[in-house]
């Protein structure tokens, strides 16, 4: 539906022409923050989004490879929300660049939508060593354009969608012969399986997925598992 709307230049419409006096601050521009801003703006509320990163989108931008969610689609959806009159202020970390108390004074309401950017940990010895990442942190680094040294062997622990994303992204990076994410078309993330698929695209790379249960019990989408194996 979203692609259909963007292709045809459809725009969101407000539900009222009344401009309300109550101002709302939204902390975070991920799915929750953008959704709240959209709903409030349609109802006539002046909304300002405060985003800590230099681009809006949250996990949509930094946790999903662009092969799943292309940047132009995400940018188009966000632009449609901003066109409702929503103000966006990036590189504004609440608690550093502006205090929460200041927001409370300037706005009638504050919606906190800071998201969940921390990945799950195994709580085992060695997981804090160099070269060990959670899927969330790894995909964030890649999508942010950070350089990541992968080496020739990658192991993805887990059987979910994020794993696949991480694997596939790794392979694409290795295939380009660079750890710079901005030199290849990054892909959106379904955490564990995706990582393995990316790593395997490199002819010289070795990628393995370790999962504690059986293949049939893997939570990743079935066709994603098959595509990862084909790669």
Where are these regions (language model features)?
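Residues forming the flavin
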Residues: 2-231
